[in-house]
Amino acid sequence: MGVASRREAEDWIRAGRLTVNGELAVLGSRVGRTDHLRLDGRLIHRHEVVAGQVYLCHRSPGENLRTPEEPSEHQALVDRLPRRAGNRFITVSPMPRIDGGLEIVTSDGGLAMQLQRTVHALSSEFSVRVLGEISEPSIQAILEGMLDRGEKLQVENCEAGGGEAANRWYTIVARGGSGKDIRQLFERQGAVVSRVLRTRVGTLTLDRALSRGQFRPLTKEEIDALISPPAADAAEADAEHSE
């Protein structure tokens, strides 16, 4: 199955935590690739971590995933990544070049495709730096989540944080929002935004020990949590993609 050891799976079955196609799993059951498995109601996406592939948590300083053929005054991200998987890397839901923060980078195309879908079912947290303070009516308008193109973003929270000189930081939590969407929510209220940083995707948080431009390997547990969001969230994402 690629998501647990045999002993762990047997423990889940005995505890009645694992279902196959809506039915409680029993010891000795055979599971095919088209069967739907859920653990505690949470859909299990059976993606195996592939040996030799690279799975990274990257603290983006605000840049595109450039190749060596695209000159830049800064060292390209691809030049800093591990060489063993070649030079083909994919950034999942990349932050705009002028912003930065948490990004997921992988050389595994199959995983990248799954993550592109599931990240829209997960709540993400952003820190937004603006000039001056935002009024309470503007905060309420941001919470409504209306975007320029007429779409509506599900904003779960928006609150003021600290400040530095004339700038103020705001923390916003939204489901499936991109860095561009978050910036747009604030600019629609007349805010002058100088920085948008993504600090969390689902349960994966930005590692503050990482300097800008650095990365660390993702653990298997972190990957599993990203590709297997809670059942209710996955169902919501499916509904959005079917519209």
Label the predicted regions.
Residues 1-243:
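Basic, flexible Lys/Arg- and Gly-enriched helix-loop patches that mediate nucleic-acid binding at interfaces
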